[in-house]
Amino acid sequence: MQNNSTSFPTAIFLMGPTASGKTDLAIKLHETLPVEIISVDSALIYKGMDIGTAKPSKEELALAPHRLIDILDPAESYSAMNFRADALREMTDITAQGKIPLLVGGTMLYYKALIEGLSPLPNADEKIRSEIEARAQQTGWAVLHQELAKIDPASAARINPNDSQRINRALEVFYLTGKSLTELTAQKGDALPYNVLQFAIAPEDRSILHERIELRFKKMVELGFKAEVEKLYARSDLSPDLPSIRCVGYRQMWEHLRGDYGFDEAIYRGICATRQLAKRQITWLRGWKTPIRWLNSLQNEKNQKKIQQVFYLSMQNR
């Protein structure tokens, strides 16, 4: 869990759904506070995926550099565990320079991993996964779900009998460790050694967010989003099974290039998928376990002042 002790250095979290104005506000804060920005975004980590991720422009990055952007090729995978290790390293470096880490983004799972620590879950084992898949082909996933119910009733109650991926993972964890997924996830890792000031930004009216998402997606298309995905599609080492290609927008454009549906349909589906992502992000934030100060996307100047006031007040109380 997060530490609130004043003996710990300060960090700022600026969270929010996609298209809520996080980047613009972060750049403004970089101009007025002694902060260095760390990206908390599972799409911005990939090189060559600039337009569809709304990655900060070269000009914006020159004004306010973002760490943990463009660190991986799209063929590579990246986990919450990878992020936590990388983010803690960057936070330590920023703190050592006498500055404040400002973590900005909308990948809520990464924030959760950073604040709460990670359960000691084993890495995937392809051999065991293949064996489980083979059994499922013979008996059906419903039978394996019944097996899971005997091993781990709590997980079985949460997992739909048709959710093959989650059934496979829960059984895999048990076969590897001899312990249930429920038991292992109850064990948390180390607490975050920072006093975190948490902010979330979003429009008060969700229809405004929906409109912004549509306008931004159409702007991406004008800027050459399809051509960007075409370059990825031409690579033999990329597929829609990879996390990079599953990113909203990219998946829909990829399916269009594959011939699944037309260009206009890809745009429509991309907008819908982005809105669904925003809804999930807001749901995460509404259920956040630690205190969050909410900001209105339409009041950026006021938001900047509010964060400054909270920051300086926290520093006075140290």
Swiss-Prot record:
Catalyzes the transfer of a dimethylallyl group onto the adenine at position 37 in tRNAs that read codons beginning with uridine, leading to the formation of N6-(dimethylallyl)adenosine (i(6)A). Belongs to the IPP transferase family. The record marks 107, 129 as: Interaction with substrate tRNA. Gene3D superfamilies: 1.10.20.140, P-loop containing nucleotide triphosphate hydrolases. Keywords: ATP-binding, Magnesium, Nucleotide-binding, Transferase, tRNA processing. It is an enzyme of class 2 (transferase). Pfam families: IPPT. HAMAP family: IPP_trans (MF_00185). It catalyses: adenosine(37) in tRNA + dimethylallyl diphosphate = N(6)-dimethylallyladenosine(37) in tRNA + diphosphate. Its cofactor is Mg(2+). GO terms for molecular function: ATP binding; tRNA dimethylallyltransferase activity. Substrate binds at residues 18-23. ATP binds at residues 16-23. Its EC number is 2.5.1.75. NCBIfam families: miaA. The gene is miaA. The keyword Amino-acid biosynthesis does not apply. This is tRNA dimethylallyltransferase. The keyword GTP-binding does not apply. The lineage of its organism: Bacteria, Pseudomonadati, Pseudomonadota, Gammaproteobacteria, Pasteurellales.
